[in-house]
Every structure is written in structure tokens, then in C-alpha cells.
Curated annotation (Swiss-Prot):
This is Photosystem II reaction center protein J. GO terms for biological process: photosynthesis. NCBIfam families: PRK02565.1 (NF002722). The keyword Thylakoid applies. PSII is composed of 1 copy each of membrane proteins PsbA, PsbB, PsbC, PsbD, PsbE, PsbF, PsbH, PsbI, PsbJ, PsbK, PsbL, PsbM, PsbT, PsbX, PsbY, PsbZ, Psb30/Ycf12, peripheral proteins PsbO, CyanoQ (PsbQ), PsbU, PsbV and a large number of cofactors. It forms dimeric complexes. Disulfide bonds: none annotated. Keywords: Membrane, Photosynthesis, Photosystem II, Reaction center, Thylakoid, Transmembrane, Transmembrane helix. The gene is psbJ. Belongs to the PsbJ family. Coiled coil: none annotated. Pfam families: PsbJ (PF01788). InterPro entries: PSII_PsbJ, PSII_PsbJ_sf. Residues 1-25 are annotated as: Disordered. It is found in: Cellular thylakoid membrane.
Length: 66
């Protein structure tokens, strides 16, 4: 993570510098810190769809199909 001292009591680092430029470079946003929530939700949603699809596939083939 960043070695900057946070001015906020809860430890947040400002998103922008005083001149308006991003405080953290774009590339660092993907390699440091927490994963973006949309990325976690997308991966989780795809996993849920896969498992549900596997159950539907299993209901039409194999032991429970006849």
C-alpha cells in the first residue's frame, strides 16, 4: 500500500491531489490495495451461474434424468 500519512481520522487517502490529478496512478489501482467491488461481483455472479447451470445439466443427464 501507500506510505502516505492520511489527513483523515479513518485512514482514507484523498482520491485527487490539490491540482486535480489522480492521487494514485491508474496502473497502481489494479495492483495495490483492495479489489474493485464490480470485479468481485462479476466473478461471483459468473460462479453462481456456472453452478446453477451444472445443476440443470445434471437434472437432464445421468441418474435423475429418467
Amino acid at each position: 500500500m501507500s506510505g502516505k500519512k492520511s489527513p483523515y481520522p479513518d485512514g482514507r487517502i484523498p482520491d485527487r491531489n490539490p491540482d486535480g490529478t489522480p492521487a494514485v496512478p491508474w496502473r497502481s489501482r489494479w495492483t495495490e490495495g483492495v479489489l474493485p467491488l464490480w470485479l468481485v461481483a462479476t466473478a461471483g455472479g459468473m460462479a453462481v451461474l456456472f453452478v446453477v447451470g451444472l445443476f440443470f445439466y445434471g437434472s437432464y443427464t445421468g441418474v435423475g434424468s429418467a
